[in-house]
Amino acid sequence: MDPVQQKIKQQVESNPIVLYMKGSPDFPQCGFSMRVSQALKACGQPFTHVNVLEDADIREGIKVYGNWPTIPQLYVKGQLVGGCDITMDLYESGDLQKMLQEAVGG
């Protein structure tokens, strides 16, 4: 596994909830990242974010790691949940809140 993939694997496995996004939750740099980060904040569980705009290797590497072509990408307990559409569907159904609560042991 190359160093970028190893770094991503470490990030995903050492944090229960990780959002790979453009920008930060307070200053998102794209509408899709903004929507997902707002949904996560509304769920009330702490989450880690990685700003892919700060590291081109991570920005391209996360697409390979998750076999998912777009950003944002949400990982919960080491597994890719999906991008904006899937995350928003889960949020609107109430399933995201349950998933995140279980991930942090609540």
Language-model regions, residue ranges each:
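Thiol-based oxidoreductase modules, predominantly thioredoxin-like and allied folds used
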Residues: 45-60
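Thiol/disulfide oxidoreductase modules built on the thioredoxin-like
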Residues: 64-70
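Local sequence-structure signature of Cys/Sec-based thiol-disulfide redox active-site neighborhoods
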Residues: 10-46
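Short secondary-structure boundary/capping segments
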Residues: 9-10, 88
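Non-catalytic, surface beta->alpha helical segment in thiol-disulfide oxidoreductase systems
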Residues: 76-105
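Acidic beta-strand-to-loop metal/phosphate-binding motif
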Residues: 20, 73-77
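N-terminal organelle transit peptides
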Residues: 1-4
